[in-house]
Amino acid sequence: MVYAHNLGFPRIGIKREMKKTVEAYWRGEISQQQLQQQAIELQLTNWKIQAEAGVDLIPVGDFSWYDHVLDMAVRVGAIPSRFKALNSNITDTMFCMARGQAPNGIETSACEMTKWFDTNYHYIVPEFTTNQSFELHHDDLFKSTKLALENNYRAKPVILGPLSFLWLGKCKGESFNKLLLLEKLLPVYAEIFEQLSSLGVEWVQVDEPILVLDLPPEWQQAFLTTYQQLNFFNLKCLLATYFGSLDDNLSLTCQLPVDGLHIDYCRAPDQLDSVLSQLPAEKILSVGIIDGRNIWCNDLNRSLTLLENIQSSLGDRLWVAPSCSLLHVPIDLDQENKLDVELKSWFAFAKQKVAEAAFLTRGLREGRESIGAELKKNEEVIISRKTSKRIHNPNVEKKAASVTERLMRRQHEHSIRKNKQTAQLNLPLFPTTTIGSFPQTSQIRCLRRDYKQGKIDDALYEEKIRQEIAEVIGIQVKLGLDVLVHGEPERNDMVEYFGELLDGIAITSNGWVQSYGSRCVKPPIIFGDVSRERPMTLRWIEYAQSLTTKSVKGMLTGPVTILAWSFVRDDQPRSQTAKQIALALRDEVQDLERSGVRVIQIDEPAFRECLPLRKAAWQDYLEWAVKCFRLASCGVKDETQIHTHMCYSEFNDIIEAIAALDADVITIESSRSETEILKSFEKFAYPNDIGPGIYDIHSPRIPRVAEIEELAVRALQYIPIERLWINPDCGLKTRNWEETKEALSRMVDAAKHLRKAFSSEKTPTIDLELQPAST
């Protein structure tokens, strides 16, 4: 029989119960027993939603209090030694690995965090050593599976496969071949399968998303040997791939001794024919035909026709599913009561997406007439979207068509610009700055909420925001920072804020998705041509600059990041949408410069995460991404200093594209990787200024002055002294004021020590063996 199933459901809860509960636990306001009870309630709710929608096989084990990769590391005992001695409680150990701090107050450096493939979700990077051992450590998966079965759900446990787990991890200390760990790791996976089998489970979903990447031959071979060795203890295994095409890994994937294969049709429709021709006759094919990464409703008529053709070849060996876990979309469109009615009809969130999968499955089982009403209603929606006049703006399209190469070049090269900027800004050696946002207190969040709900008027809102900006400027001046920011109190999110002010973009009320841990974001929905009617940031920056003689940065989010962190229209190339955003930002940049702003930051933290997963497609992306940044940033004079910021980036393979952005200063997130990212600059002479993040803002832990100095001096191995900036590694929005002021005070102290050590002597007086790079 054709089944409807799902790869994973959002964890956060319809009202973000997960966030509220886990943060209460971190604050010591609830017990661990209360924490676990909330986990049970959230999972039961998720399973009920899916079952009532008509999903046959319910994913179990997709819930996590922080991150599923972290859960897998803890489950198999891959707990770094620095955490083992700190916490006997496995839950607190997990939180300490993620945050550097457990609820019991014990601190150490957190594990590294990076992006999950090309999504905006972050995972905690497993750490492996040459003497790594593994053992079954955590029973959360088994408890959840038992709970689902006891509640009469047909449970399909979901785990990250052994090869993807190793690939996504990192060698700590001495480098070695991670594949050597398989011998110790596979017996633990076998234990997991044995316990699941003993519970009466029929199917297990093993996620191996790295099969859509360019894999070295030894990793391809490892798939064959690994899955031949794995003992599933009579469980049926659905091997799940997503985010791209199997491509050159298709043949080996079809050889693996598993019972079913899931493919992502939405991201890689061209692979379908090859998969059908190579799939062994006994295996299930799960077709991910519902887009798990975007919010547009499915064209059910078109999808059903495609699935009917597949069914004619496979019969009951066909399953229907979303393309990937629904972790990446909001939970329930029914919670949106402020969206424009026509726009809302075009959307589908997680609850609606599992219903779409169930509708299609019923159509395959019982014939089209069984879902005739749904098909008719859906067809009306699809036609409405295609013919709506609100999508296209002739003025925007004309402006985009008139863009020339000249608009994407600064007046002179960076060396000339730097001399002019140095004369104008009068900055010291090792200039200090922050990335943009400052702590957002509950009072600020309540202020914005009350303003949006009409509880306070424009005048009171303006007064309160100005008070906050004045306080932030005053704190920075007192701390001794060199280039200031206004703190962004008016912004709820660095992308959503601009989405609210740009035409062609819709904002939801409850469209939350998980970014990392308890942090949730509400991605804007780009439904049509994008344009700017009026300045978006000018009044706040002008006010902030009026309070100080020091430079205050204009703060913008770049075109690629707005694109990456939004749900994007799928009726034109993403590059065209990015160009429209860039043109809107260019107007804002020029308005800021005309008002006297001397430093403008255009954040592109998503620049690398948007890289296609296959290298063959990189060049095309990098070309249009660089052009869009330059289109946004190059309309200013030489004297205006352009900054950009990037997160979680490995620069080695795209360093030339980073340089091609031609930002005067780039700040990068590097503290958790212990400045390993800076090795990118070892062989490539990056010509512009760099500010490597020298303390981790994602952890509540406050670094010592000596730690900051050490990281800065390490950076000098790769960056000439006159080009090195001192800054945190990301915005400070999620930290509290006490942490922020103390950490920044230590950062400024470290910069002062560095100036003293390097300004008057050829060799630093700081007691470190590292020597600075030459110019």
Swiss-Prot record:
<dbReference type="GO" id="GO:0008270">
    <property type="term" value="F:zinc ion binding"/>
</dbReference>
<feature type="binding site">
    <location>
        <position position="603"/>
    </location>
    <ligand>
        <name>L-methionine</name>
    </ligand>
</feature>
<feature type="binding site">
    <location>
        <position position="647"/>
    </location>
    <ligand>
        <name>Zn(2+)</name>
    </ligand>
</feature>
<dbReference type="InterPro" id="IPR013215">
    <property type="entry name" value="Cbl-indep_Met_Synth_N"/>
</dbReference>
<protein>
    <recommendedName>
        <fullName>5-methyltetrahydropteroyltriglutamate--homocysteine methyltransferase</fullName>
        <ecNumber>2.1.1.14</ecNumber>
    </recommendedName>
</protein>
<comment type="similarity">
    <text>Belongs to the vitamin-B12 independent methionine synthase family.</text>
</comment>
<keyword id="KW-0808">Transferase</keyword>
<feature type="binding site">
    <location>
        <position position="730"/>
    </location>
    <ligand>
        <name>Zn(2+)</name>
    </ligand>
</feature>
<dbReference type="InterPro" id="IPR006276">
    <property type="entry name" value="Cobalamin-indep_Met_synthase"/>
</dbReference>
<feature type="binding site">
    <location>
        <position position="609"/>
    </location>
    <ligand>
        <name>5-methyltetrahydropteroyltri-L-glutamate</name>
    </ligand>
</feature>
<feature type="binding site">
    <location>
        <position position="565"/>
    </location>
    <ligand>
        <name>5-methyltetrahydropteroyltri-L-glutamate</name>
    </ligand>
</feature>
<feature type="binding site">
    <location>
        <position position="488"/>
    </location>
    <ligand>
        <name>L-homocysteine</name>
    </ligand>
</feature>
<feature type="binding site">
    <location>
        <begin position="435"/>
        <end position="437"/>
    </location>
    <ligand>
        <name>L-methionine</name>
    </ligand>
</feature>
<dbReference type="GO" id="GO:0032259">
    <property type="term" value="P:methylation"/>
</dbReference>
<dbReference type="Pfam" id="PF08267">
    <property type="entry name" value="Meth_synt_1"/>
</dbReference>
<keyword id="KW-0677">Repeat</keyword>
<dbReference type="Pfam" id="PF01717">
    <property type="entry name" value="Meth_synt_2"/>
</dbReference>
<keyword id="KW-0479">Metal-binding</keyword>
<dbReference type="GO" id="GO:0009086">
    <property type="term" value="P:methionine biosynthetic process"/>
</dbReference>
<keyword id="KW-0028">Amino-acid biosynthesis</keyword>
<feature type="binding site">
    <location>
        <position position="669"/>
    </location>
    <ligand>
        <name>Zn(2+)</name>
    </ligand>
</feature>
<dbReference type="InterPro" id="IPR038071">
    <property type="entry name" value="UROD/MetE-like_sf"/>
</dbReference>
<feature type="binding site">
    <location>
        <position position="645"/>
    </location>
    <ligand>
        <name>Zn(2+)</name>
    </ligand>
</feature>
<feature type="active site" description="Proton donor">
    <location>
        <position position="698"/>
    </location>
</feature>
<feature type="binding site">
    <location>
        <position position="115"/>
    </location>
    <ligand>
        <name>5-methyltetrahydropteroyltri-L-glutamate</name>
    </ligand>
</feature>
<dbReference type="GO" id="GO:0003871">
    <property type="term" value="F:5-methyltetrahydropteroyltriglutamate-homocysteine S-methyltransferase activity"/>
</dbReference>
<feature type="binding site">
    <location>
        <begin position="435"/>
        <end position="437"/>
    </location>
    <ligand>
        <name>L-homocysteine</name>
    </ligand>
</feature>
<comment type="pathway">
    <text>Amino-acid biosynthesis; L-methionine biosynthesis via de novo pathway; L-methionine from L-homocysteine (MetE route): step 1/1.</text>
</comment>
<feature type="binding site">
    <location>
        <position position="603"/>
    </location>
    <ligand>
        <name>L-homocysteine</name>
    </ligand>
</feature>
<keyword id="KW-0489">Methyltransferase</keyword>
<comment type="function">
    <text>Catalyzes the transfer of a methyl group from 5-methyltetrahydrofolate to homocysteine resulting in methionine formation.</text>
</comment>
<feature type="binding site">
    <location>
        <begin position="16"/>
        <end position="19"/>
    </location>
    <ligand>
        <name>5-methyltetrahydropteroyltri-L-glutamate</name>
    </ligand>
</feature>
<keyword id="KW-0862">Zinc</keyword>
<feature type="binding site">
    <location>
        <begin position="519"/>
        <end position="520"/>
    </location>
    <ligand>
        <name>5-methyltetrahydropteroyltri-L-glutamate</name>
    </ligand>
</feature>
<feature type="binding site">
    <location>
        <position position="488"/>
    </location>
    <ligand>
        <name>L-methionine</name>
    </ligand>
</feature>
<dbReference type="InterPro" id="IPR002629">
    <property type="entry name" value="Met_Synth_C/arc"/>
</dbReference>
<keyword id="KW-0486">Methionine biosynthesis</keyword>
